[in-house]
UniProtKB/Swiss-Prot annotation:
A Pfam entry, by short name: Globin
Binding-site list for heme b: H63, H92
Cross-referenced Gene3D superfamilies: Globins
CDD domains: Hb-beta-like (cd08925)
Record's keyword annotation contains Heme: yes
Domain of life (superkingdom): Eukaryota
Classification via InterPro entries: Globin, Globin-like_sf, Globin/Proto, Hemoglobin_b, Hemoglobin_oxygen_transport
Protein family according to the UniProt entry: Belongs to the globin family.
UniProt KW keywords: Heme, Iron, Metal-binding, Oxygen transport, Transport
Expression tissues: Red blood cells.
Protein name (record): Hemoglobin subunit beta-2
Gene transcribed to yield this protein: HBB2
Residue ranges of every copy of the Globin domain listed in the record: 2-146
Assembly: Heterotetramer of two alpha chains and two beta chains.
Amino acid sequence: VHWSAEEKQLITSLWAKVDVPEVGAATLGKMMVMYPWTQRFFAHFGNLSGPSALCGNPQVRAHGKKVLTSFGEALKHLDNVKETFAKLSELHFDKLHVDPENFKLLGNVLIIVLAGHHGKEFTPSTHASFQKLVNVVAHALARRYH
């Protein structure tokens, strides 16, 4: 994947302002609200009975932070995202049996959350750059499935 200097700048400049624990929790919680079948991977997290329970669940919040922290690794390795996520791809395929479509869903929810948190700063160019990034990350995570 080729990244232009502008794309890299847009991504890194917005990411520097992202509250990873908050955005991670919001993203994972909203994904489970919007796509309830994804909750089956997190049944051991306790109360997932509705939007308030999901978004306030400490385990959802902690895992959301972990997911977004991992996503942040992609920014450090934009030219080698596949290798960066090779072990996570294996884990999600071999042990967790996650449908790779869920990676795309999570990426799309992240875009929505970022847009909501950053308003006018989340310009069409920034949106396009992040959409490209979440697609690259989703593809890298699905790599082991191919």
